[in-house]
């Protein structure tokens, strides 16, 4: 279906701007002409002056003619707004070509490209040796990678051309290789350069002739008795277990004492808190203690109450809960 072109109508905002853009009138103000069908206030008044006995524009406009012209002009404006805002009929709605031209051009381009691709795939004979693999990287990416490779090679060459930075102990290493300095002198030189290091000369002490130290390190070298594994070993093992049990009991006793101390401390704290609460309540209600100390009068049975029976002990039941118990529970 072809698209029918139609003359573009004025937009609502543009038409209102055109409607209210007035022409400067001397002594009256700015009154705008909507279009050729809606005149201005001045021209409308001049045309209607003849109805009231005036002889043209030279006779001027009085207040009555201006009021009538203003009323007629307002009426024409209202009629114009009413016609402008009236909805169009569905049969008369036709799209403008500019609304669909971009979509149509894009659709036509896609159709032509897909048709060419399909024809190339179905009709064109391509030799197998002409079919090449697709590129893994685009040309832009390949150029970037080649540039980075060139920069890395340049940096490596520059590093090789730079002179070697002397190490911290270069002179000492050279002296050690030449043998011109003794080991002790080189060690002293290292400690002199690194002032944060410290050492103590002759710090190693050799105890070759100390029998007590040697005996402690070697242990007891005496031979065990013949009945060691039958009798002595059992005694040693029993002593070991007894010592271990004593240590355990001591730890348990210390733990129990600590728990009792913590429990007593907690009880004291609770007692202090209760005393504070009682003191606070007593200070807030001074008449409470006096009320509690007052004697309670004894209940004396009235003979008139027992005249018709002891109704106070009988259950009071009106069957209200059986009928309206659920309703009462809802409200209360």
Curated annotation (Swiss-Prot):
Transmembrane segments: none annotated. GO terms for biological process: chromatin remodeling; maturation of LSU-rRNA; nucleotide-excision repair; positive regulation of transcription by RNA polymerase I; positive regulation of transcription by RNA polymerase II; regulation of transcription by RNA polymerase II. Component of the SWI/SNF global transcription activator complex. The 1.14 MDa SWI/SNF complex is composed of 11 different subunits: one copy each of SWI1, SNF2/SWI2, SNF5, SNF12/SWP73, ARP7/SWP61, ARP9/SWP59; two copies each of SWI3, SNF6, SNF11, SWP82; and three copies of TAF14/SWP29. One of its GO terms (molecular function) is rDNA binding. It is found in: Nucleus. Keywords: Activator, Nucleus, Phosphoprotein, Transcription, Transcription regulation. This is Transcription regulatory protein SNF6. GO terms for cellular component: chromatin; cytosol; nucleus; SWI/SNF complex. Residues 278-299 are annotated as: Disordered. A motif (Nuclear localization signal) lies at residues 2-8. Its main location: nucleus. Present with 2900 molecules/cell in log phase SD medium. The modification Phosphothreonine is found at residue 165. Involved in transcriptional activation. Component of the SWI/SNF complex, an ATP-dependent chromatin remodeling complex, which is required for the positive and negative regulation of gene expression of a large number of genes. It changes chromatin structure by altering DNA-histone contacts within a nucleosome, leading eventually to a change in nucleosome position, thus facilitating or repressing binding of gene-specific transcription factors.
């Amino acid at each position: 279906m072809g698209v029918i072109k139609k003359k573009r109508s004025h937009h609502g905002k543009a038409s209102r701007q055109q409607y209210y853009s007035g022409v400067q009138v001397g002594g009256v103000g700015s009154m705008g002409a909507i279009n050729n069908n809606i005149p201005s206030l001045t021209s409308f008044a001049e045309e209607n002056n003849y109805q009231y006995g005036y002889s043209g524009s030279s006779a001027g406009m009085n207040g009555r003619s201006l009021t009538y012209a203003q009323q007629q002009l307002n009426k024409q404006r209202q009629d114009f707004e009413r016609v402008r805002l009236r909805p169009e009929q569905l049969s008369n709605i036709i799209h403008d070509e500019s609304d669909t031209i971009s979509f149509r051009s894009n659709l036509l381009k896609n159709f032509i490209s897909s048709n060419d691709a399909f024809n190339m795939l179905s009709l064109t004979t391509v030799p197998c040796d002409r079919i090449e693999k697709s590129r893994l990287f685009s040309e832009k990416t390949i150029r970037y990678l080649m540039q980075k490779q060139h920069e890395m090679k340049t940096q490596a060459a520059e590093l090789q051309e730079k002179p070697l930075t002397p190490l911290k102990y270069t002179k000492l290493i050279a002296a050690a290789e030449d043998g011109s300095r003794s080991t002790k002198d080189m060690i002293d030189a290292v400690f002199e350069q690194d002032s944060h290091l410290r050492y103590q000369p002759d710090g190693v002490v050799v105890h070759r002739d100390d029998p007590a130290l040697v005996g402690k390190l070697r242990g007891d070298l005496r031979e065990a008795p013949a009945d060691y594994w039958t009798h002595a070993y059992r005694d040693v093992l029993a002593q070991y277990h007894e010592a271990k049990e004593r240590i355990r009991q001591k730890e348990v006793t210390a733990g129990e004492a600590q728990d009792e101390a913590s429990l007593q401390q907690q009880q004291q704290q609770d007692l202090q808190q209760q005393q504070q609460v009682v003191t606070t309540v007593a200070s807030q209600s001074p008449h409470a203690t006096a009320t509690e100390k007052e004697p309670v009068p004894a209940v004396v049975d009235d003979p008139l109450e027992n005249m018709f029976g002891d109704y106070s002990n009988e259950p009071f039941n009106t069957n209200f809960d059986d009928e309206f118990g659920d309703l009462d529970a809802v409200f209360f």
